[in-house]
């Protein structure tokens, strides 16, 4: 956080538990929505106490990080809950394993259609940033979706 504070640059607060080796074992939640939101609230509060500017905070609910398929889908269905945090929201679901589970597709490069569906959903919820692999396809679908949702 010293770098963020020193250079006054934007950064992403991402919800996750553990690390890449053990995060899948840490996916037990009483209520994934309230647990993730509460965790993000605490992370934001801690960063603000370190004199980090509010305008530099971007929030990511951490799709795929210490969450199973049902948790990821529950978060996607309730993106409006995270918009209520009043910070820009980033969703990074591109080619994630849960998309592969839904599509029965093991090859991540063959999951772009699922990513496109999520990008459309993000447009509907006015999500600020989507992290994607196939930029051209997502740009095109978001251009159409934005015209539909924003007139």
Segments and roles (model prediction):
Residues 41-56:
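Phosphate/pyrophosphate-binding loops at sites that engage ATP/ADP/AMP, CoA/4′-phosphopantetheine
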Residues 63:
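Active-site metal-binding loops of divalent metal-dependent hydrolases
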